[in-house]
Curated annotation (Swiss-Prot):
The gene is cobT. It catalyses: 5,6-dimethylbenzimidazole + nicotinate beta-D-ribonucleotide = alpha-ribazole 5'-phosphate + nicotinate + H(+). PANTHER family: NICOTINATE-NUCLEOTIDE--DIMETHYLBENZIMIDAZOLE PHOSPHORIBOSYLTRANSFERASE (PTHR43463:SF1). Belongs to the CobT family. The active site is at residue 311. It comes from Leptospira borgpetersenii serovar Hardjo-bovis (strain JB197). Its EC number is 2.4.2.21. It is an enzyme of class 2 (transferase). Catalyzes the synthesis of alpha-ribazole-5'-phosphate from nicotinate mononucleotide (NAMN) and 5,6-dimethylbenzimidazole (DMB). Pathway: Nucleoside biosynthesis; alpha-ribazole biosynthesis; alpha-ribazole from 5,6-dimethylbenzimidazole: step 1/2. This is Nicotinate-nucleotide--dimethylbenzimidazole phosphoribosyltransferase.
Length: 344
């Protein structure tokens, strides 16, 4: 159907439901967006998935996080054992969760984890390099991560899946997100850097100092979004970008989580601008950089719950709102079918 014709048809269907026009607020714009993504006036959500990409960061060794980098691989075990917040929310909402080793500094090949049905081995390397010294990734590694992300979207997600959320796990990755955001949006680092997983004031100041040094070292040589990603990103961020772009090409709804996932989306959007129409921004994080990212697209996130967890938790929590948008569009009576008089 012609997009302009579909907009008219969807908007008419929304407006003729037994309610005052616009009274369902964001649910109405969300129903319209989902219908346009799926090119139908009767959309549905099939086989929802959330992918959690895990990777370590060389910069974590410099003290930019409140937690040791071992927490990354420990949380991978926790995800696969069903014990994390994202597990609880996925179970609550019947969402399939898959965990991707994009670049964790740990070998899972000697463990039964390697055979877990929800574990995806896509390791590019055992963590990125320390960006205080050199770029996080080589050009080849960055391309490999992007390609593996696209492969996962194509081969490791159910073929009938039409809605997919993106989460991450990686000690130190809020630092990468801050550097990506500052570099691409031309913002001062202090405007886009928060305390991450809970740094005290002294350690937060140390984080700022380290990130300013990283930016000063590399910024003059960065000309493209790819170069920003290669220099400041992580394997999990790059792989997420590849999966986002591929999923959008497949006509899926893209659920964007918090600060790190949205910094990945920033690069994805620079690489493939059409991806924006598929994106649903699930929540507003307390990380200051996230607010600047959302402002880049004038995005209105579905939730504002003070989240700063990652893992794709915001995607899972917001998912029932998408279900509600679909439910009213498909199941609510129209004025005509219900024999209810419309506004005079």
């Amino acid at each position: 159907m012609n997009p302009n014709e579909l907009i008219v048809k969807l908007q008419s269907k929304i407006d003729l439901k037994t309610k005052p026009p616009g009274s369902l607020g964001t649910l109405e714009s969300l129903a319209l967006q989902i219908g346009l993504i799926q090119n139908t006036d009767s959309p549905e959500l099939k086989s929802p998935h959330i992918l959690v990409f895990a990777g370590d960061h060389g910069l974590a060794n410099s003290g930019v996080s409140a937690y040791p980098k071992e927490v990354t691989y420990q949380m991978v075990f926790n995800f696969l054992n069903g014990g994390a917040a994202i597990n609880a929310f996925c179970k609550q909402n019947s969402i399939r969760l898959k965990v991707v080793d994009a670049g964790v500094d740990f070998s899972f090949s000697d463990d039964s984890t390697f055979l877990h049905p929800d574990f995806i081995d896509a390791k590019v390397g055992f963590g990125t390099k320390n960006i205080l010294i050199e770029s996080a990734m080589t050009k080849e590694e960055c391309n490999q991560a992007l390609e593996k992300g696209a492969f996962i979207s194509t081969k490791k997600v159910s073929s009938n899946c039409n809605v997919i959320g993106f989460g991450e796990m990686g000690i130190g990755n809020t630092s990468s997100a801050s550097l990506i955001t500052a570099s691409v949006l031309k913002k001062d680092l202090r405007e886009v850097t928060g305390k991450g997983t809970g740094l005290n004031d002294q350690k937060f100041q140390k984080k700022i100092t380290i990130l300013e040094e990283c930016l000063c070292k590399h910024q003059s040589s960065l000309r493209t979004p790819f170069e920003v990603l290669q220099t400041f990103g992580g394997f999990e961020i790059a792989m997420m970008i590849g999966a986002m772009i591929d999923s959008a090409k497949k006509g899926r709804i893209i659920l964007v989580d918090g600060f790190i996932a949205t910094s990945a989306f920033l690069i994805a959007h620079k690489m493939e601008p059409t991806i924006l129409k598929n994106a649903v921004f699930c929540h507003k994080s307390v990380e200051p950089g996230h607010i600047h990212l959302l402002e880049e697209w004038n995005a209105k996130p579905l939730l504002d719950l003070g989240l700063r967890l990652g893992e794709g938790a915001g995607c899972a929590i917001a998912f029932p709102i998408l279900l509600s948008a679909i439910a009213f569009l498909n199941d609510m009576a129209s004025f005509e079918s219900a024999k209810v008089d419309q506004k005079l």
